[in-house]
Amino acid sequence: MDKAEHWFAVSLAGASFPFIRPAVLGWIILMSLSVVQLRSQEMVSASDTLASEAARLLSEYIQVSSVTGTEREAGEYISDKCREKGLHVEIFTDSIDCYNFAASLYPLELQKPNAVFLSHIDVVSGGTDSLWTYPPFSGAVVSDTVWGRGTIDMKGAAIMYLMATSSFVGRASMEDLPFNVTLLFVSGEETYGERGAEIICDYFMPSLNAVVMLGEGGIGTAELLSDEPDKPVFFISLSEKRALWLELEVNYQASGHGAVPPSDYATRMMIHGLYDLTRREPEITFNNDNKGMLRAYGELEKGLKGFILRHPVFFRPLVASGLRKNPLMASAFTNTSTLTHLASEETAINQIPHRVKACLDCRLLPETETGRFLDNLAATLGHDEVSVRIVSETRNAPPTVPDHFYDIFTESLEEVYPGCGIVPFLFPATTDNNYFRNQGVPVYGIIPAVLDQRLMETIHTHNERLPVEALLKGTEVYRGFIDRLFMKSPEEEPLPETEAGDAPIDVSELQDIP
């Protein structure tokens, strides 16, 4: 009973029983207020306890460094925490650079239709410690914020998953619920899933029996809408760009003394090509996914701006001009090429190197063919001496079509963030999600936390951090999703059965894995 209900009950008592003495009525009012206050204190205390536990778990998880290739120790830590919370843990692969496991409300062998929360154990390097306010693997908790590599990408989400799912352990032990809920932890996402998601898809999908997945991708921001700058807007990714990593090399024999430079030499050729590439303004390309994003965004905006966004093709010049002013938004409409490495063979300062290498991190829109992209790249580089080699390339996948699981999740978002906006979109980066989309599983990329631009810019650089409030809100959203899920009947058939290992295996036993 809330405060309003207490006042109504007390007023009704006074009206119905006028013989109640004022002193007694005052005592009733005082006791009613005391009950309300006590319950309020209990709620605050429970919230504080949850916040403290969430912060502690994330801090400890951060402290176990798990730079790609060294995931096992952190994987063992978080799998132990899942067991302590009462989840059923199944280890799929167990090696230092390939630790993959599931933690579920019910054992996987029951083959219940499964809602899967996907996260990756690995993180990128912490970089230079001196650039951090607190060391990258300290897990420092300062002013209700957890600091460290992986807090946003994506150990924070893993803790949200764990806190939300484990709250249903007692209920699952007493009821035969219609769905299983599983936390899937994988390795190697930062190097495109060859030691994690790819192995799961090749060998363990029948065990998971996944009917929906939630993974990384979009996030919430409250700095988007012109007339409602405080209104949170959540972006849920239904598809994503794919990655193409390239190595450029110039191997050119020329005279070697820096005091007498020849007309052409390796570093000059490379710099000229890269200069043209980095100055080129990428073409704005509309496809069904990013047009849908603009239209959904336009529904939230008011006035002329909203009208223009809802008709992006007709107002293409205006929309393109606006996109170019926002690199984050523009990246969902362009093929990008980012120079991440540039090096020459080690020589003396006065010695001209004969070999120079550069690396490009390219992200391609789903409809872009690799061959055509490479042809355009070669034309831009403009020099036959610059060779191009593909280092790594990820696969396309069909976009996820929103279904009833999408509706359930958006309802949960709206309950925790009343009045929020929701925009389906094409994620401009690359995650493990496409592996599972290619298996026919609907995958929604979203971390339900509201982060400002300042926090989002810490991903993959120094001072990455996540407010504890974001942990709590995200946990509430996932808990609401699970609760609503259990009100539904399974509507999808299990995936067809294929052979899969029953026991933990060492990755070396999988013959097809490099």
Predicted regions located by residue number:
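Acidic/His- and Gly-rich active-site-bordering loop/insert found
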Residues: 42-149, 170-179, 360
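Acidic/histidine-rich catalytic neighborhood of metal-dependent amide-processing enzymes
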Residues: 146, 152-235
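Bacterial Sec-dependent N-terminal signal peptides
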Residues: 1-42, 508, 514
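Short, solvent-exposed loop/turn segments at the edges of secondary structure
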Residues: 26, 98, 134, 178, ...
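Flexible glycine/proline-enriched surface loops and loop-helix/loop-strand junctions
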Residues: 229-233, 251-258
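A short core secondary-structure module
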Residues: 198-203, 258-281
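An extended, acidic, His-containing surface patch that forms the Zn2+-binding/catalytic region
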Residues: 87, 110, 124, 221-222, ...
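A common structural junction motif
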Residues: 121-122, 277-281, 379-386
